[in-house]
Structure formats: structure tokens, C-alpha cells
Amino acid sequence: MVERIVNSEDVSLLVSGRQSNPHKFLGIVSENSSQDRIILFRPGAHSVVVELQGNIAHAQHHHSGIFSLTAPKGTLPQDYRIYHQNGLLAHDPYAFPPLWGEVDSFLFHQGTHYKIYECMGAIPYNVQGISGVLFVVWAPHAQRVSVVGDFNFWNGLVNPLRKVSDLGVWELFIPGLEEGTLYKWEIVSASGEVLIKTDPYGKRFDVPPHAPSRVVDSDRYTWHDAAWMEKRKHRGDQPLAIYEVHVGSWQWHEGKPLGYRELAKKLAAYCKEMHYTHVELLPVTEHPLNESWGYQVTGYYAPTCRYGTPEDFQFFVDHLHRENIGVILDWVPGHFPTDGFALAHFDGEALYESIENHEPLHPHWRTYTFDYRCNEVVNFLLGSALFWLDKMHIDGLRVDAVTSMLYLDYGRQEGEWSPNIYGGRENLQAIEFIKHLNSVVHREFPGVLTFAEESTDFPKVTQAVAQGGLGFDYKWNLGWMHDTFRYIQVDPLFRSYHHKDLTFSLWYAFNERYLLPLSHDEVVHGKGSLLQKMPGDTWTKFAHMRLLLSYHICQPGKKLLFMGGEFAQGKEWTPDSPLDWHLLDHPDHAYLHKCVARMNALYCDLPYFWKGDGKQGSFRWVDFKDTENHVIAYYRFSGEDRSSALLCVHHFSSGYFPSYVLYCQDIHSCQLLFNSDDCCFGGSGKGNRQPVLCLDQHVSWGIDIELPPLATLIFHVDFVN
């Protein structure tokens, strides 16, 4: 009988919710040489009906929810199905061998299971011709792990997982479940506490907070972007005009944010109109708070459900690709929130979070930092990045808060952190993680870009890993951004004393490959909108806006502008309301909008702005010493070509000079291409006179230009051979 097969201690552990290997005695068990026995566990059930080889049979009830029935010798999982309490007729979850293997354990423990997103979480699966869902989770400190959902009435005793690895990996294949099934993990900690957790590897969640995960087939979507993906592999130096977007507040319809599909069409058309090459999305990874920016991530493998399904998000990316617009994701591997339903103390103890510092919470955000010493945690983060690149076709990752990852003492006081093994402040494990991330991303997905938000002078951020660098493609030039805003907010009368703020960044502009950000961070927390930062009356404010944004385009480095800046959003950005698109009905805003579109078009069309822009040879000063008139001028070159250039002139005072001479030699011809003070952009109309060469015995020594107030002029220059 069943008592001879099943150990009473195993049953006791099962009934009390502490069993780590239910497959040891549940499922198909050999009873003797002539027959098998099917052993089932149905807590609270009075009867269990089984379809065995086409015949209906009632299992015998023993005790404590244990049922059994005899079966022919050699019975297979395909030979019988169980009528479950929810009405589902499906095969026995406890009749199948483990699917997680030794190779999986080895790679996961090494932190190199780069397809971990196909093995962890809830994966639609087919085993021996039987369809269902494979549930896998890492919880090394747990006594017991169960999957709960509507299919078992959220009863954690019904479907306990089996521990399949000494690493603490748990697994259960449940036949008959399908895509869309709701589920959570029920975890019994080492201390006996029962925890209900969402899936760290969940690909879809319901409305937060405390939302259950949903089973998703990430491969179901049919992509139409093959041409884009192939072209991306072979990218060389290219223009990057990035439009930074918060999905929930870009545009609304009938009082709600646009969904992914509607947003795809409107945003793609808008980016083409404005000549943006890429969009960068503030984090769309799942997060608990509706009114947040998305940086408190609880679902690292799931696009937020607020705007649609994962398939809707795939459509969004696909559509932008078909319109030749890239998609960059703001990704947050530096810290995670303390919400108890997600990663925090996942199995009852610190698992994903670091306990290296004396104070576990990050002082700036009151969040946990990841434990980069643990390879399984590193693999979780690498898997997240690679999932978005593989399954969602993302073109780039902007890695948030890199500085906080690089330094152990970031934001901490003395006594709140411990030095590394060399006595230094560098977080050696985080640095290795970053190098690993960039190496594997660039190897597995050629053409994908990575960006570092890094605010210190940490060396070699954009040098290759093989050359001792961190391996990023670009670093945000936050120094340039701070200097620029500090200068432009000064009244023009006093700018002579701040001239170095315009010139200082050019001393280090080629130490790294830089992106120049005018990002969301500068229009929040009381800093005001870009327009509000500008000094002067209304006309002067808009002249400053045209000057700022054209200066941004002309400077060496790739470009990023946060939404609303292109038409001078009047108020500070907030994530819980849409941009003020009605402002485009006002001439000043419409003129600026037109000016930005023209500047972006020039930027994309003229390689002088972007070809080799990370190299010293792409830039040469013409004049940086005119502090009295607040003028700077410089050449931008296209790669190694020195036969021609763009001459960029920026005038930061409100004065007007009908004749202003720049001392520049060997010019053969010079033609005005762009004037931010043109009437068509809302300017005064000054500065449109074509330049006049200054000659001495037929040799040019300078040019005479008309210099309008608060304006940028761009000239195309051919040099004497």
C-alpha cells in the first residue's frame, strides 16, 4: 500500500508546507514488479478523479490529502490526467523529470547564463508533447516554494516546487496552464515566515501595487524590422539626435496616457517631423507607483502594464524601427525599492541586496543596492539587459546612476561604508559587472549602444574593456550641462565674468565619447522648465531658447533633449499630466518648434556635426577670448577632411553688431547656412547678411559678419587648397 512507498516524515513536511522535494514520492511510483502507483496530494479534497488511459478512475483517499490509485507497469506522464478542483483536466505536474540541468546551474553560478530569461520565471513549455507552464525561481534560503494562482485558488500547499539545485533553484512544470495565467510565489523562509512575492523574472504584471505576474510567451510577436536590425549591426559613426520621453506624460487622449500602440504611430510621426534619430524612454520596466518616473523598478523583465501588454510594447519598438527610429531604454541596475512584494528580502533574507555597507539603504533614494559580489544576482541583471535587447529589440541602454555604482562611499558619510580590499572607495565588483555588461552586450548584439550617466572623472568610461575601460559607447557630459545652465541663467550684463563656463568643457571634451544631455533631471524639483531658466522678457527668453538649443547642436558630442524642450514647455515637468501641446498655437512656441526641427535636420544631414565628434580633430577654436561681447566661434570638421568645415558662432549678449570681424585664415568661400535670429524662427531678422572675406593682397585673414543678438550663426566654409 501507499504507506510502504511514502515516508510519513515526507508527508508531514508536505502537509505542513515545508517539503522541498515533493517529486520524491508524488507522481508515478513503482509499487512492485507488476504495477505502478500514482500518488497525488490534494489538500482539503474529499475525492480525486483521474482519467487513466481513457478510463475514469477514483483515487483512494488515505489521509492528510494523500490520494493514490494503481496503474499498469510502465505508466507514463502522458497516460493519465487529473480533474483539478478548478475544472481543469490536465496531466500530473509531479510526473515529470526535472528540466533545469547541471549546465544551467553551472552557468547561473558563474553569472554567465545569458539566456536565463528563457529558463527562469514562468515559461510556456512543451514536455513530451504536453503543453503547460514551467515555473522556475531562485530562492536559496527558502524551506519551501510554491506557485499560487487562480488555478489552485491561491493555496500554497497545492503546488510546491522541487529544489533542483544546491544553488537554491526551484522548479515545477504544470501541464494545462496557458499564457495569461496569473501567479505569484509563496515562499516559506528559513524562519518559517510565509512570504507572497511577485516573480523577479516575470515578463508581465497586472496593475500595481502588489500585482500578480502573468505568464507570457515573449516569442509570439511577429517582427517586421529585419532591415533595421541588419543595418544596425553595421553602424559606423552616426548622428544621434535623441528625444527623451516619459511614456505616461507625452500625450494623453480622453484623460489618459496613450497606450503603446497608439503612442508608436504618433511618436514615430512626430520624430520624423522633428528629425530625431532615436527616442530614449524613461524606465518602462514595471514599477509600483503611478506618479513616479519609473526608476523604482520591481519588474526588470516586464514593460509596465499601464500602457499595454508586452506584445503591445513589441509593436511599439517594431513600428519605430520601420520608421527608421531607434529605441533606447533607461535601465536601472544600481538599486531597487524596498517594497516587500518584490525583490527585497526575497526569500526571507538579503538575496538581491548588498549587505556590504553598514547602512543597507542608499542614502539618496532609500533603496537597496544590488549585491554585485553574487554571481546569481549579476546574472539576473545581465539577463534583464539581454532580454530587452533580444526579445524587445531595444537599440541601446542608458545605464542610470553609474556613479553610485562605482563608488562605495557615494552619498555616504564616514563610518557608513567599508573600503575595498585595497583600501579604496571603488566598488570593484560593480566595476567588473559594468565591464561584463558592456562586453556581452557588444558581443551578442553588434550595433547596440550603451550610455553611462556618470558625473565624476572616473577614467576610461568609454574606452574598450580590452584596453582597461568600462566599455560604454557614450558618457553623459553632465559637466557641460551644468556649466551651460550656470552661464545662460546669468544676466547678459554680467556674463563676462562667467565666460569660462562656455569654454571649460572643451578642455576635456575629447577625453571620452560624450553625449550632451538636456534631460528630464533639469526640469524637475523646483529647477523650472528650460524656458523658465532663461533670463529677460518674453522675446529675450525665446531668443535664449533658440541660442541654447542651437549651441547644444553645434557642440561636440551626441545630442539628447527631453520632451517639451523643443517647443518651450512653460512649466516644470510632472509625470502625472501631459505636455502643454496647446502652446504650439502660440507663435513664439511654434517658431521655436520650427527652429528645432531645422537644427535637427542640419545636424543629421551634415557630417561636420557628428562624424568623428569624439576626436580632438573634429573641433578647432576660432575665438574663445571675446569676453566683452560674449562671443565664441569655432570650426567643426567632418572626420579627417580639412578642405571644408562648419564655422559656428554664438553670441550671448543682447547687443547687435552690423559688422563683426572674426580672424580666421585661408578661407576660400563662406556661406551662411543657419541663423537662429531669422524671422522664420521668431527672431529679429538680423544676421542674414552673407559674410564678406577680409583680404590682404588677395589672401584672406578673416570674415566680416552681421552678428544678431542672442543668436547662433552657422556658416559653411571652404578653405584655400
From Swiss-Prot:
Gene Ontology terms: cellular component: cytosol
Protein's recorded name: 1,4-alpha-glucan branching enzyme GlgB
Biological process terms in GO annotation: glycogen biosynthetic process
Record family assignment: Belongs to the glycosyl hydrolase 13 family. GlgB subfamily.
Record's catalysed reaction(s): Transfers a segment of a (1->4)-alpha-D-glucan chain to a primary hydroxy group in a similar glucan chain
CDD domains the UniProt entry points to: AmyAc_Glg_BE, E_set_GBE_prok_N
One Pfam family of this chain: GlgB_N
Entry EC number(s): 2.4.1.18
NCBIfam families xrefs: branching_enzym, PRK05402.1, PRK12313.1
PANTHER family referenced in this protein's UniProt entry, alphabetically: 1,4-ALPHA-GLUCAN-BRANCHING ENZYME
Pathway: Glycan biosynthesis; glycogen biosynthesis
Organism ancestry: Bacteria, Pseudomonadati, Chlamydiota, Chlamydiia, Chlamydiales
A Gene Ontology molecular function term of the record: 1,4-alpha-glucan branching enzyme activity
Source organism (scientific name): Chlamydia abortus (strain DSM 27085 / S26/3)
Functional description taken from the UniProt entry: Catalyzes the formation of the alpha-1,6-glucosidic linkages in glycogen by scission of a 1,4-alpha-linked oligosaccharide from growing alpha-1,4-glucan chains and the subsequent attachment of the oligosaccharide to the alpha-1,6 position.
Active site, renumbered: D400 (nucleophile), E453 (proton donor)
Keywords carried by this UniProt record: Carbohydrate metabolism, Glycogen biosynthesis, Glycogen metabolism, Glycosyltransferase, Transferase
Oligomer status and interactors: Monomer.
